Amino acid sequence: MESNAFSRIAEENMQGLYRLSFSILHTRHDAQDAVQQGLLRAWERRETARPEQIRAWLTRIVINECHNIQRKRMRVVLMGEMPEMAAPEDTYEAEAELRSAIDSLPEKLRVPLLLRYMERYSETEIAQTLGVPVTTVKNRLFRARCAVRAKFDEEVTFE
């Protein structure tokens, strides 16, 4: 892949990658680090990328970087230090409750939900990104929606 094409694709996906990273890591600094490190790794391996799956490939790399950062955090916590936590930015109560409900989901349910409804990935793209069958993605999305709905007295509409 040419450097101009890679730069364009990275630029087009950067905000979505950041939002996903932030939803996993909950701090701006770590989310920025994950995206930057992920794009650097992608740049180094850009020749191996298949153009038809570039978005899923980039997303998977950044998710892996988020996991690396989480592992580093765990080591810090085990050594007795507490990681810096971001203060909630949402000022509206409903948004804060929704974010809390989504954040409380296990990662295997939270990531597909965020990719589907925040980043507008198709179920097929999510399956490619996560390396699971489409039926698994559908099941996880269903379970995630049910879990979020259970946090509220009234039904939440995602679409």
Where in the sequence are the language-model features?
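Structural recognition of an alpha-helix C-terminal capping motif at a helix-to-coil junction
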Residues: 19, 33-40, 44, 52-64
